[in-house]
Amino acid sequence: MKGGKGGATLPERGQWPDKLVIPAFVGAALFLIAGFLLAFLWAPPVAGAQVDGVELIAGNMVSNKLLLSQKIFYFHMPVALVSFVALAFAAYYSIRYLITQQQRFDTCAECAMKISLVFIICTMITGEMWTRFEWGVWWVWEPRLTTYLVLMLIVIAYFVVRSAFATNASRRCTFSAAVCLLSFVDVPICYAVTRLIPSSIHPVVLREGGLSGDMALTLCVCLIGFMCLGFVLYRLVFGQTRVSQRTAQLIDQVSKQEEAYE
């Protein structure tokens, strides 16, 4: 990867991550299909219950419709984790930019933030579906939901900042890097808030005895599938940005040549 300070040039095609796109796409398709089948055909329902009509489980009236909330979990949690991973990569590239002032790192951070926003929106949608099925309402001002909503707003603010400083590359890159790092600070808060605040009613899944073996396997299959999908989407966005940069460079070169002939 070449380029001095302020360089915005991304590497040419043919780098080793580009060679992983097709295998990752195939892996995403296979694992997500397998995860869907495992979630709906193999993994046990809530508390291992087989509900016929409406039954009383753990003091709650449960129906087949309500049991869908447990199936949503197999997709809700993986997309949330992928959004955290994408934010981690964005924060890494933002730090690289702040250290080196090379704009290509800012571009990589922007690509990762786009993927993070996609998966954050998916997390919010699946989370609202789970909330509606499980708690009977679309939204609860519960600590986990609230902190994740704050995270989404910060990520949206990242793109607002980039638009606000569209004509000033230095400020755009610096301020957006700061917002990116601020969003990443919220990640451990989102993860730990249910453990730190006893009043939180959001379930804590990753704890001892929280998942049976078949549920954990289904969750891992879905997680691998969404991780592969996230990587593919990132490389597609990265490739599109690379083409846009090359096009802009060619247009600039042609303009300079025309000016020289004149």
Features from the language model and the residues they span:
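Polytopic transmembrane helical bundles with strong interfacial aromatic enrichment
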Residues: K2-E262
